[in-house]
Each structure stands twice: as C-alpha cells, then as structure tokens.
Regions:
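A short hydrophobic/aromatic micro-motif that marks alpha-helical segments and, especially, helix-coil
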Residues: 18, 116-117, 141-142
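The canonical Cys-X-X-Cys-His
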Residues: 138-149
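Bacterial N-terminal signal peptides that target proteins for export
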Residues: 1-9
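Extracytoplasmic c-type cytochrome modules immediately beyond a signal peptide or single-pass transmembrane anchor
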Residues: 25-137
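Sec/Tat signal peptide C-region and signal peptidase I cleavage site
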Residues: 17-23
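Inter-heme linker and motif-flanking segments adjacent to c-type heme-binding CXXCH motifs
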Residues: 126, 148-153
Length: 153
C-alpha cells in the first residue's frame, strides 16, 4: 500500500512539475529573465572561481572554489531546461539554432556540466593544478556554445 501511495505521489509531483514548464512558455519576459539570471550566475561564479584557482586572492580551494564550483555545476545542469520548445521568442541573445539544433545545444550544455563537475572534484581535492585544467575546460565549453548558439554583443 505504502509503495503504491509513494508511486502515486511521485507521479503527481512529476506531472505537476512539468505543467509550469509548458504553461509559462507564453510569458517571454519571464523565460528570458530567468535564462539570463542563470547564465549570469555562471558568468560571475566563473570569474570568482578563476580568481581563486589562480590564487588571486589566495583562498582555500576546498572552501571558496568548492562553493563556486557547486553553483556552476548546478546552473550548468539547468541549461537544457531553459530553452524548451516554443520558447524561441522575445528579445534574446539566443540564436534560432538553439531550438533548430537542440541536440547539439544540449551536447554543449553537457560538456559544460562535465567541466564544472571536474572543477568541483578538483576543489574537493584541494588540487590547484586540476582546478586550473578544469577552468580551461569550462572556458572552452562556454566559448564553444556561445560561438554556435549566442548572438554576438
């Protein structure tokens, strides 16, 4: 009995969680503002992570870099959800190719998620050399996606 109740609750939660995703697509400003906020989260945490990784300022990686890496990893994981089908509208820096080549776009997001996960592991290990390599991969992942899927400023 408990198992079937748990399954029913889980199914209901999944359905309820999916509804706002489709119900809000008609609100371009909300989608664009949220996307920009998540991307800005990545940008600012990346800047801070790079500084800490380079020892400027000299702070412990397993404290400061760890916090930034967690935020970056979490935000990177959200990226595919930020561009659902039907949200290609409004004033945005996202190119149409985000939706036209969703598989390729999601592959770029996966590369970023993997790079931020490597950064997180380096921070946990307090390994500055590994953190530096991971930050290079984060930068490459961001640039690769921006080159293909973001309008130039």
């Amino acid at each position: 009995m408990l198992k079937s109740v748990s399954s029913a609750l889980l199914a209901g939660a999944l359905i309820a969680g999916a509804l706002p995703l489709h119900a809000e697509v008609d609100n371009p400003d909300a989608w664009i503002k949220y996307r920009e906020s998540v991307m800005n989260t990545l940008k600012y945490h990346s800047r801070a992570a790079k500084a800490v990784t380079e020892g400027k300022p000299a702070l412990p990686l397993n404290v400061h870099l760890l916090a930034h890496a967690r935020a970056m990893r979490d935000a990177a994981g959200f990226i595919p959800d930020l561009f659902p089908e039907g949200s290609d509208f409004g004033e945005t820096e996202a190119k149409a190719s985000v939706w036209e080549d969703k598989e390729g776009f999601d592959a770029h997001a996966k590369k970023l998620a993997e790079a931020t996960d490597a950064l997180l592991k380096a921070a946990e290990a307090d390994d500055r050399a590994a953190a530096g390599k991971a930050m290079q991969q984060v930068g490459k992942a961001c640039k690769g996606c921006h080159d293909d899927y973001r309008e130039k400023d």
